[in-house]
Amino acid sequence: MNRNDITEKIITVKVAKGLKWEDVARQVGMSKEWVTAGCLGQMTFDDKQATVLGEIFGLDAEEQKWLQVVPYKGSLPTQVPTDPLIYRWYEMVNVYGTTIKELIHEEFGDGIMSAIDFSMDIQRTADPKGDRVNVLLSGKFLPYKQY
């Protein structure tokens, strides 16, 4: 048994029960974005959160322990994503990455945007030309240290 097995079980039960990530997150007491990332194997849950997820998804004690193991983050099955939605993000970074970097450096100086001290919010906005996906990424700016 490993973390991937638990992720597969969570997805299987979610589909079978017709659950929504937002409802799961509400029970865990965290954002839907963070809980979804965790359930998909990208975050570490604490004991209390793992217990709640165990109740929701029918996970036994050993399976709940796997939710508390630090995962190998950013582990996609291929170097270049093949899923169309994930590929669009890859494409956006390829097209706009240098622009984002330039504008962040112009505003903040030489450094990076943290993906650790970070939050994300995904919302739907109605639009007569087709609903829009709004994604807000908020990461702490970390300047490079001079030494």
Cite the ranges covered by each PLM segment:
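Short, charged, solvent-exposed linker or helix-capping segments at domain edges/interfaces
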Residues: 145-147
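Helix-turn-helix/homeodomain-like alpha-helical modules used for DNA recognition
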Residues: 63-143
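Long, hydrophobic N-terminal alpha-helical segment
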Residues: 1-65
